[in-house]
Amino acid sequence: MASAAPDAPSLAAAQKLAGSWSQTGQVEKAIWGLCQGSGSKPYQAIVDLSGPAYKCSCPSRKFPCKHALGLLLEWSTGRVPVASQPPDFAAEWLARREEKAAAQPAPAAKAVADPATAQKRAERVASGLAELDLWITDQIRGGLASMDTSWEALDGVAARMVDAQAPGVAGALRSLAGAVAGAENWPDMVLSELVRLHLLVVAHQKMDRLSGPLRDSVRAHVGYPVSTESVMELPAVREHWMVMGSRITEEKRLFTRTTWLLGRAAGRWAILLDFSHGSPNFSGVVPPVGHVVDADLHFYPGAAALRARLGTTHADAEPFTTLPPGNIEAALQSYTDAVGADPWLRSWPVVVTDVTPSYVDGSWFLVDRSGEALPAEGDSRMMWTLLGISGGYPVSICGTWNARCFEAFSVFVNGQVMAL
């Protein structure tokens, strides 16, 4: 059940609910129960095992919440009895899920791209990027010390990029505003991003001279759309994919689920991105963290292809108990290789084994047995949780490296992956 938890504290909280359950039950593909909290009314928790999907009446923003996790723990230990039918609160939610699944429209006929429309968009993008490059030049000439790095200023430039149909560039500018807020080394961060964006503008101007994969990368970073249908038509990569981590984020009620996969045989990384507006109820089904699945992945085109879509699965997912080796040197080299292929990448997933989380003079590091260290960053509670899980001993950690710091998304302890 640990693989379903959004983080270690949620799992710990779920384990404390063992004596709080009543009216639990299960049918073939669902479990439910009432969990008494601090209020007068117990929380109603439901898990659709076929998803899995979760529902709870509590106000928690974590997904799944501790009540859904606690219900799964009750079920896994055999304390949820079989019932003839679910109660009304569970039956209604399950029925709505079935109706939603049945109402999924049939695949539409593949639309043929209009060359005139594509050309018009390319011209709008080119015009917008030319304005962006002029703005970048003005910032460099005026000096970064006088640059307005406020959210309002950068959001104004980002809005212009949205109008120019370059949402990838707009997202980079908005992310920059959040990154520089309060950062001591913000001039270095700003300069690096401005250089990256200038290089993207130049590459877009000379796309006809680029190789096919690099041209695809430029289009992806600018924000040209790629249809799901076209991706699924690309050759599949069949592997035993290990689910190394999963994280749900939210921005303006848009929930994004990122799932990191690692091919057991070839060591190739992939990420799956799923989106849901209003609530974290994702339609796509992915194997839980800590499981390996024999499946096909279809990768989005690019010079360092990483994002993919899940295709045919050839067997049920099952837990894995070992990780491939991965030291700090190999992690840095894999990042270097990826950026060498796609210079606009900001981070790359890596595994580092036998490293110890260390807190030194207000900063976090991952230190291997030879004394080599990687600077690490992340939410303070998450980093202290990581240290607590390790117990001060070497562990294997999965995360992303961005040339500046390592950000963990899971830890491997005693043959089990725990999401952070």
List PLM regions with ranges.
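Long, low-complexity, compositionally biased intrinsically disordered regions
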Residues: 1-420
